[in-house]
Amino acid sequence: MNTAPIRPAAIDRDADGTPRSREHGDIYHPRGGALAQARHVFLDGDALAARWRGRERFVVLETGFGLGNNFLATWAAWRDDPQRCNRLHFLSIESAPPTRADIATVEREAPLQPLATALADRWPPCTWNLHRLAFDDGAVELVLAFGDVAAWLAQLIASVDAFFLDGFAPARNPAMWDARLFKAMARLAAPGASVSTWTAARAVREGLRAAGFDVALAPGANGKRDITRATFAPRFTPRPTSRRAASSAVRTQRASDDGDAVVIVGAGLAGCALAAALATSGRRVVLIERGTEVAGEASGNAAGLFHGVVHAADGRHARFHRAAAFAAHDAVARACARHGVPGSTDGLLRLEPDADADANSLQSLVDALGVPADYVRALTAEAASALAGVTLAAPAWHYAHGGWVDPRALARSWLADAGSTVELRLGCDVDALRRVGDRWVLLDTDGTTLVAATTVVLCNGSGAFDRSNGTPWPVRRQRGQVSSVAATDLDPKAVPRLPITGSGYVLPAIDGRVWFGATSQWGGDDGAVRTDDHRENLDRLGRLIVAAEAPPLDRVTGRTSWRWVSDDRLPIIGAVPAASTESLGLGPSPSTRLDQPRFVARAPGLFVCAALGSRGIASAALGARILAAAITGAPSVVEADLIDAVDPARFLSRQFRRSEAARNREASSAVQPPEAGSPGAA
């Protein structure tokens, strides 16, 4: 996906105060008012009140978010309707997004003003991501995509009930109205999906017809004669031949909503985050944990960090970890506010490890990528030191959405949010997983059935990679040790005000102790705290903070744990490939293609979220969103190529492609004619 820099909207005001796009020379809404147009063209045009009545969810996709008036009007109508759907999903794409100040200061009609204030408070940085903003306890979900409309349409995974086409006039903004728009709409449309738009341009009507929509003109408003309305009614049932259609069909294993609970194995960060996400979607959960407490193993450190990534290529790794950092920020901010969880979302500093780098080179990278200052800033060592309250050895990145949190408290807060919809079973060790009929049966070490369900999610770290379960994913086990010391045993000038990372990390004082680290060694089973590892961590601390004098070793304590890391350093999140499940009684994979993950058949109702590596907090928060959408059938709040990047089937596909390439090379060499002068040459 090409992530070219995003230009925020340049908005002028006409003499009467109507906002106007400087780029397109067009007004954002008619002078008769934004709310009147939203109601007449979109809410009435798509018959929202009648169509969402009594439904579990309703999905709207808008092209052209503008200043958010259509979303705000839809949200207000949903709130005022006692027969509304349980959940409203509103997806919107905007190539030139407004700023937070634009959202906050634009004049609104009275019914929309309090909602606009809530929207401005949650407004995200202008980055290439799907930004999820949840309102009304998660019942209303706004998903914003900033950047090229055609590029984003190709990345969406959703079944859309109503389309709002609200870009600037086709003559002024043709890129938003080309054939790619209508083709993507046909792919995303649910049966009977509706379309409304204020324009009656012939090219728009013809494009909709060619894509399988029945099109009609309707009376306009605010002095406009006609508007366009349409209904998806293709002559033939679309086949999932496109890349994204195939991807969605094979990997979205929507669980039957027959009252059967979703079973999650593992009550660490990943399992608890998913339990909360499913509870928000109205699903019951049975959460099984072999230990005697929640988040007692790899998730059991006193504190953990979350932050984004800056990389010149802005590839899948950088974009995934950026999205994960945003998800973690939202989760931690909520947990701190609602449950008093120890943590902070006030930012984080990451020292640049490149000895040749300076603040100017860091800023040049920020400028080239076009990332905004409310996501990341490049700071000199002096500026970073002033922010941290300690003397730092190098220039740094300041991630405004970074921070730290107590992982155990965060996990418990997720379960508190889920409430009675989650049944927690501690001390249950899942020894085997078997397929019996159309259900998964989980057995303990005595062969006794613990639970049976149609949908199971493996979030149990090492247990998810038990090869007896047929999971040939390349992962390695990594031991890590963190160290801590009483804040009074350190020079006050060595205790930072906010988290610092780089060659290691150090956190602010938490309950009177400063945590820092961490070592990493592959393999091994030694869980004892090692003095040599404390020395290594103290050395890391000294490389982060200038003149951080080491305390006596006998005053340092610590903790060890293990984490799983995949070969490509990305987590493993999604539906388990059927090609991995022969030992579970499913037989050989029915898949006829293995070259791309999207074509690999999946084990019905079996998912995994594991190998979260060193970014467990952030990856757990985002992984929960990915899996909740896949299980419930809700729109994905993560773009398709990032779902590709963490797909459990990616390793099978890579192995298959390597084998095919080797076979092709062998076949090519076998038919190669002998060189002149060699035996057998003519």
Spans of model-derived segments:
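The AdoMet/dcAdoMet-binding core of the Class I SAM-like
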Residues: 51-160, 179
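Helix-loop-beta segment of a Rossmann-like dinucleotide-binding subdomain
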Residues: 114-115, 312-315, 340-350, 375-416, ...
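A short glycine-rich, Lys/Arg-flanked "PGG" loop and its adjoining helix->strand segment in the class I
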Residues: 178-191
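Short beta-strand to alpha-helix junction loop
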Residues: 196, 313-324, 354-358, 397-416, ...
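Active-site substrate-recognition segment that forms the wall
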Residues: 238-257, 263-265, 269-281, 290, ...
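Dinucleotide-binding Rossmann-like beta1-alpha1 core, especially the glycine-rich loop
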Residues: 304-387
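Helical element adjacent to the flavin cofactor pocket in flavoenzyme catalytic cores
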Residues: 397-446, 450-451, 455, 459-460
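C-terminal catalytic lobe of FAD-dependent flavoproteins
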Residues: 551-682
